[in-house]
């Protein structure tokens, strides 16, 4: 039996933000309930300002394939690297009173915290080979496969949802003991001595996830930075309008799902007044944030955000071909899943749905 005993921590408490799941327009976020789960309070909404013009051309309609395998890094990121002030500190993860023991029927561990069964953490056991030269991937690929497929001249940005959290979906929600172990095991799958830069939102559970991944990799120090653009509301244009849409669907997850897949019961009814265009806004994030800001800082980057942002971004990255339609089958983005952005030496870019655990989706 392995004891998951780690160092005590105070910085997460200091980083935790006062509950502020409000949109910047001042409209309160609908709290999550057992009758109507809400993803709107999973993270801090981003800016509700008008969609700024991208520095590169972006797809103009929902039918346009995202620049997955033919896109190139924007000129600005290829010629000028804007300095980023990272915080470098010791890797510190709290002792959650958890122990682990190997599973007997699958690869992974059984987690017990404070004497109570906390769940199983299963590893990816899909033996299908990953072909980095395939034209497109529309299903989730294990993070270890992608990491091990990288050539020395490749860069990769792993965009991941945080690990398992407490019930609170607002800024007070933190990782559970199971969540720390999930993230630690993801780190073990990409262990190595090469430096990784970590990016996270302003909400503490994303930094906690980064810390645990770094620990799993064998790091004693971590270089990280908080980025407001990762707070969760990147795709939201008018949060108050989005809240009005909740009356149309069984859950708020279904609102996001129908908008992201452009799949409505009544074609005359859309949610476009509340959300930006998926393809335009997704391409803008990839071009202006991932390729121009994050990727130039290190060969390998870990970016931890929230499902409110990464669910639609993953759908964008597969041109809506990924099967994750909550409004049909209740499937949702799993913890530690998202998108791997692989950048070749010649500037071509490939998007691959990535999973850190055994499955890329979960039922919500």
Stretch-by-stretch model annotation:
Residues 350-364:
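Low-complexity, Gly/Ser/Thr/Pro-rich intrinsically disordered linker/tail segments
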Residues 4, 9-91, 95-96, 101, ...:
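Bacterial Sec-dependent N-terminal signal peptides
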Residues 110, 117, 347-350:
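Hydrophobic residues embedded in beta-strands of well-ordered beta-sheets
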Residues 119, 123-234, 268, 272-276, ...:
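Active-site-proximal alpha-helix that buttresses catalytic centers in soluble enzyme cores
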Residues 223-274:
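Low-complexity, serine/threonine/proline-enriched polar segments
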Residues 280-348:
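Active-site-adjacent alpha-helix immediately C-terminal to a catalytic or transition-state-stabilizing loop
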